[in-house]
Amino acid sequence: MRSSLLFCFSVWIAVFSHGQDPSVQMENTGAIRIMQLRRDGPTRVRYPDALPSLLELMNERSLANFDPDPLFIESLADERLFEHPVLYVNCDELPNFDFSSEENEALRRYMTLGGFVYLDAGIKASFLGTDLGHSYAAWEERAEVRQWFEQLFPDQPFTPLPRNHEIFRTFYKGLPGNEYLRLEEDQKRLPDTVLTFVEQEKWPQGTYSMVGIKVNDRLACVASPICAMGWGRDEFGAWIPPISFRVRESAEDFDETLQVASFAGQTYEVTREDGLKDEIYLVPGNRPLWVKEPTGRWRIFKYYSGEEISNYAHSFYARLGMNVFLYALLN
């Protein structure tokens, strides 16, 4: 529980699900407004419709009452920071991570007094380059984020959130079902190879790669690979933009073949959930080609696209985003 609050808010939330019981109820006294940091105004915006779409979706699927228009602030020294419970930051939108001492002190106080900070794209594997995807095995905050928060809480490093953390089941539990895919009856569902990889490795139990910082024994900040790409909807309610899946696949003789394959690109190491390292091999242009895993197994990256895959990914990211924001309000 929060020991002290500089702002006051309350919300009434009931679980919107298929066959699940409402889990949490609180008094509803008005719309909750989520803040978003935009240091360069609209010039570096990524996924401009993402957060408003997610807030509208939370209003549709729960009894929560969110203002669908985020409150944009250009500086962490903005006095309005202390009037709202959650600050959202898309780290890919920041021109740099050079904050003034006044801004850092304001953010430190905000988190100490009960504020919650969500750093989207706060995890970014170095091999991705300009790729909008992510690695399911990235469990470290990006270096700029780590250096920034070391100034605020030098004794509180980011630590990975375990798969059983409540943030992954605050509102939704597990992976999306076919009812969220919006497919016609004659359209196929996810290919079995893709679904198996997603269920067992990419997003096990509907979880994700996240790290967080605790302040006064309360989770006050989380960082994740980019999620906003999965929140946007157009005026007709269709998901935008299209999302493809990158999965790892193996086949007979892969281990022997890839060890001797000709290769002219770069390699990067990525930290896995178990702390071991995957070695990623890239073709020119920073597109992952294959991976050498610490077990000695080699697998190739294969890319799948299509409406059923895109809808599934959007459903997952939207459910995850809802879990994060509702967790922030309830803890």
Model-derived regions, located:
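Structural recognition of the beta-strand scaffold that forms the well-ordered cores
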Residues: 33-36, 85-90, 116-120, 157-161, ...
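Short alpha-beta junction capping motif
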Residues: 86-133
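Extracellular/periplasmic catalytic domains that process cell-envelope and extracellular macromolecules
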Residues: 25-29, 79-83, 102-103, 110-112, ...
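Acidic, glycine-rich loop-and-strand cores that form catalytic or ligand-binding grooves
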Residues: 145-222, 227, 254-259
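Aromatic-Pro/Gly-enriched surface loop or interdomain linker
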Residues: 20-86, 90-94, 228, 246-331
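Bacterial N-terminal signal peptides
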Residues: 4-15
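Short, surface-exposed beta-strand/loop micro-motifs that present aromatic residues
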Residues: 21-25, 75-77, 204-221, 235-236, ...
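Short, flexible/disordered intra-domain loops and linkers
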Residues: 45, 127-140
